[in-house]
Amino acid sequence: MKVVSLFSGIGGIELGLHQSGHTTEIFCEVDPLAKAVLSKNFPGVKIEDDINEIRELPSCDLVAAGFPCQDLSQAGGKEGIDGSRSGLVKKLFELIEKKEHANRPPWILIENVPYMLRLNRGKAMSYLTSVLSELGYTWAYRTVDARCFGLPQRRHRVILLASLFEDPKDVIFSQDHSEPDLDGKPSVVDHSNYYGFYWTEGLRGVGWAREAVPPIKCGSSVGIASPPAVWSPYEDIVGTINIRDAERLQGFPEDWTNITTETGKDIKEGARWRLVGNAVSVRVSKWIGENLSQPKGSISDFEGELVTKTWPSAAWGYGDKKYKVPVSKWVANTEQIAISEFLNHPLKPLSARALNGFLGRAARCTNVNYSDEFINSLERCKDRQLQKV
């Protein structure tokens, strides 16, 4: 398929589609650093600067749009689908509406965060699905955990696929696997495992993950990186992962974002974390691309319970019909790679200040029961860091 990419970021959707036999005809990305990453890794493909400057949607088989999540995420401003950033997806529909029905792109692929299913009672999903139906598309969406492809990062994202002439259920609901209980709780630890967590949190939650890391974030609004930490009980060490391992956790090759800026300087690490944290998992889009090339058929017609008040984790619809779909977040069941075996680069030890901040928050936390072994190990790590000063 020929792909037109909007809100391209660093090309996570497109790399996965390329790996499954599809080609990108044009990118559209406003961020200068993301554009530089695209230029480096997709040489020769045209890059438009701003979706607001596009007057006509080029002819294609599929439009990919991982539109901005800042207004829809739990950590963002929560302005919703009418926010200045997430609301840019409306431009996509304006471009499609300009075309005659028969000339509209046969497929539309949209990606965003699961929180949009709950924010403002799911107003964003209500908007997306209603507009797609008005434009003549049948749609299906599913929340997918990228960890099901074997990479040790827990990452849930909503994948919305719409088709003008075919049935998107044959792509989105062609596989389903039970979700394993992988992560356990911070109150119980095993010496043989590594544990991932958010060292910047600790007061209300920690993102605990056994032999994996919680979702890679894009960092702060001022470009300060906040990579997840990994703790090894056996080695009695705790540190943050390397940006090159973070790229691999997202399905990219190492140094995908290692570019030279327009000023001739090397890109700052905080900027790389932002780019990688905002990216779509390559493994997820590769799965979609493979199923688009060879649809396996939906495991059921799913014409049972209708969507009523709240949006479920998966659904499909056409016209004014919206059906719940009882499937898991695991579309594959690839053998899991432990984070202890996955990392190519050493952990960067957390500073005494960072550890002290986390330990202080953990001490005040009332809804997470941290094991004494975890807390005591972090105290020892802090003491060793202080001795170095």
UniProtKB/Swiss-Prot annotation:
It catalyses: a 2'-deoxycytidine in DNA + S-adenosyl-L-methionine = a 5-methyl-2'-deoxycytidine in DNA + S-adenosyl-L-homocysteine + H(+). Optimum pH is 8.0. It is an enzyme of class 2 (transferase). Its EC number is 2.1.1.37. Rapidly loses activity at 37 degrees Celsius in the absence of DNA. The gene is ydiP. One of its GO terms (biological process) is methylation. This is Type II methyltransferase M2.BsuMI. Disruption phenotype: Essential for growth, it can be disrupted once one of the components of the corresponding BsuMI restriction endonuclease complex (AC O34303, O34885, O35025, YdjA, YdiS and YdiR respectively) has been disrupted. Triple deletions ydiO-ydiP-ydiR, ydiO-ydiP-ydiS and ydiO-ydiP-ydjA lead to loss of susceptibility to MspJI, which only digests C-methylated DNA. Residues 1-299 form the SAM-dependent MTase C5-type domain. Monomer. May form a complex with YdiP, also seems to be active alone. The active site is at C69.
